Amino acid sequence: MYPNPLIYCTCWDPWNLGPRKLIKTPQLPRKNSTGSSKLTPLVPAPKNHNYLQPTKPVVSPKMKIHSARQEETNKSFYEVINVSPGYQLVRNREQISVTLGDEMFDRKKRWESEIPDKGRFSRTNIISDLEEQISELTAIIEQMNRDHQSAQKLLSSEMDLRCAEMKQNFENKNRELKEAHEAELSELENNYKAALKAEKLAAQEKLEEMGKEYKYLKNMFRTYQDSIYDEMEEKWSKQKAKWKKDEKFERENILLQQKKKMTKKFEMESGEEDKKINESCSAVFENFIQEKEELLKQHQSDTLQLEELRKTKEVPWRRDQINRHWHDVLQQLLLMQVMQEELHAQALILESLNTNLYYTQLELQKEKAIVGNLEKMLQTKFAETEEKYKHTIQILTEENIHLKQKIISKNEEICEGCSGRLASITVSKDDSDTVQDGSKKGQES
């Protein structure tokens, strides 16, 4: 855009890189180089010498697409500018490098040979040169910023115009679409209402027909249910009578078996108890006889002593002692008789208790057997009734399914008949319309 190649405008940025920092090259040593030109390494500029203010360039979408397309082709692109003999500038999309050759230093040697009195360049001359370069660069940067601001203003105005146009187009299209949508919605609502009315009429007719058929089927099912109930009651009464007979027969058999078992047990237990009672009575009787014999022996000894005392005519206190002894012996005899009577009474009581226990055990066993038989009979009855009811339930469910299938088939037939009638009605209406149109045309002609 500009004749000077050093000027870089941010508005013209094909690589989409934005502003770059100026790279300051270090000073070469002042020794006279006799060989070929050496490249100096590039060092990024410090923060003190960052004279450029980074600004983001305003890039339109078209320029972005153009830059993205050119990135692949311009990867290896670089530009070489010879500013002066011995001072070469290389500009790439990422950096700017400067090369100082021998020619620049040879020129200094010539100046020294031509003007030997002046000597070498002083530092003041170098500083003045650098200040001139800095002033030129600041002017370039100011020009770039002005160009950038003007380009940004132009692009913003163009974008505002385009946005306004796009908004207006969008509003117009949106209005047209809304109008078309409202018209379509109104048409669809009208069509839907008409279809709903027709379907409601057809559904009411179907409901009336279905109600009549349902009443008929309900009455038929009730009669069938009553007949099945009567049959089930008859079968149940017969089975009940059979169960009662079987129960009586089984009870009699069980009671006879238990009676035999209990009689055998009672005979065995009574024999053992008789043996025990006889043994106890014999032991008591033997003890009584032994005690009786001992008492008789004592009595005889006492009588002998009395006779001896009578003969000797002892003192009367001895007689009192003997009388007391006889009195004690008689009391013991009376106690023995009482004990025998009590033992006999207790034996009778034990026999009565044993008999009562035996009879109670028999009754308990009978009741247990009756309860067990009743439980078994109830379980068998429950199982049989469950099986019978399951069978009846299965039969009834199958019949219900069959009836539902019949109802569905009849409904389908009715629907087909209604659809055929509607088709015939529509065809007849179309024929009548065509006939009326033909008659009107003939009258007009």
Swiss-Prot record:
Keyword Coiled coil assigned: yes
Modified residues (N6-acetyllysine): 376
InterPro entries: FLACC1
GO CC annotations, alphabetized: cytoplasm; cytoplasmic vesicle; outer dense fiber; sperm flagellum
UniProt lineage: Eukaryota, Metazoa, Chordata, Craniata, Vertebrata
Record carries keyword Acetylation: yes
Keyword set, alphabetical order: Acetylation, Cell projection, Cilium, Coiled coil, Cytoplasm, Flagellum
Coiled coil: 122-226, 283-315, 387-414
Protein name: Flagellum-associated coiled-coil domain-containing protein 1
Signal sequence interval, chain numbering: none
Region (Disordered): 26-47
Subcellular location: Cytoplasm; Cytoplasmic granule; Cell projection, Cilium, Flagellum
Species for this entry: Homo sapiens
Biased composition (Polar residues): 30-39
Gene from which this protein is expressed: FLACC1
